[in-house]
């Protein structure tokens, strides 16, 4: 049986991946900082450690052997080195890292994996840190796979995005939307993402990076009106002319007003799972969860709403 370590397991992506792998019969350990309760069973061991404290990681990781490591919580090169400097490489077949589309130097359309990486003013330090973590991994001998997704949504999302629209529409409140530049974005449903991650274990390719998203192109109106259709209410949209206001769109909107779509031909050509859940289907499942759980969330950047 394959032995697997998931770095993460208590938040949105890590918990969804853990639940998927447990359901499929894999033997997994999870490593979290222990601050959040784990709401599922079936893992072999729960390792509790702050991965940013190097000595603690050395104590808990040294000598452990895994066939596959899924790293869902690596944000800096230090996060990576605190793991791979101590983990045993004896059995390791793949180190699978969740990076981000934010590593690309330019935001735009149809971005391919070979596009230049670098600092992007839209993503700031987050994207640059992810890029530096990638570079550290690529320059190491570890058998890596790097995943670069677009916007991830779904049940248990810890970012206040689709839930914000659900709340506004339910309450018949106006939704301010940036107007000016017409942009298109891509989204990937969490259920699709974890299937992509699982498929990596079964695929022969190694030391590769992949863009991961559903190829469907979505405008802000598409996103908001789809939410309204699912709820059964007409959204009330108030367009904000970006040329007539001095504040940036992130102060009143949960996304940056930029094009963000990636080319996934490499993913397809290499035989990995292809995301196929369209926006309406994924948001329908998400809203069902949202209605049952009513999470209380906010976005500190959205201070002009």
Q: Where do the language-model regions lie?
A:
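Amphipathic terminal alpha-helices
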Residues: 278-305
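Conserved C-terminal active-site "lid" loop/helix of NAD(P)H-dependent oxidoreductases
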Residues: 246-273
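Substrate-binding strand-loop-helix patch
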Residues: 156, 184-191, 210-230, 277, ...
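Mid/C-terminal beta-alpha module of Rossmann-like enzyme folds, strongest
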Residues: 199-252
């Amino acid at each position: 049986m394959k032995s697997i370590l998931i770095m993460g397991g208590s938040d949105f992506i890590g918990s969804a991946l853990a639940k998927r792998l447990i359901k499929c019969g894999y033997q997994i350990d999870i490593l979290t900082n222990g601050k959040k309760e784990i709401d599922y069973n079936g893992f072999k061991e729960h390792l509790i450690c702050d991965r940013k404290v190097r000595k603690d990681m050395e104590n808990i990781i040294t000598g452990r052997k895994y066939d596959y490591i899924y790293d869902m919580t690596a944000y800096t090169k230090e996060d990576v080195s605190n793991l791979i400097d101590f983990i045993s490489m004896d059995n390791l077949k793949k180190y699978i890292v969740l990076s981000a589309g934010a590593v690309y130097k330019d935001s735009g359309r149809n971005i391919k994996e070979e596009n230049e990486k670098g600092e992007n003013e839209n993503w700031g330090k987050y994207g640059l840190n992810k890029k530096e973590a990638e570079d550290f991994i690529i320059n190491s001998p570890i058998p890596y796979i790097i995943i670069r997704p677009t916007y991830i949504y779904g049940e248990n999302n810890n970012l206040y995005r689709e839930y914000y629209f659900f709340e506004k529409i339910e309450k018949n409140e106006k939704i301010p939307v940036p107007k000016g530049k017409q942009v298109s974005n891509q989204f990937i449903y969490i259920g699709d993402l974890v299937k992509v991650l699982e498929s990596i274990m079964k695929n022969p390719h190694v030391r590769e990076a992949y863009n991961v998203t559903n190829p469907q192109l979505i405008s802000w109106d598409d996103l908001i009106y789809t939410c309204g259709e699912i709820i059964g209410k007409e959204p009330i949209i108030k367009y904000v002319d970006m040329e007539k206001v001095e504040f940036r769109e992130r102060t009143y909107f949960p996304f940056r007003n930029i094009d963000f779509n990636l080319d996934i031909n490499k993913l397809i050509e290499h035989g990995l799972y292809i995301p196929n859940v369209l926006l309406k289907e994924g948001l329908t499942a998400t809203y069902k969860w949202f209605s049952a759980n009513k999470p209380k969330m906010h976005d500190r950047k959205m201070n002009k709403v």
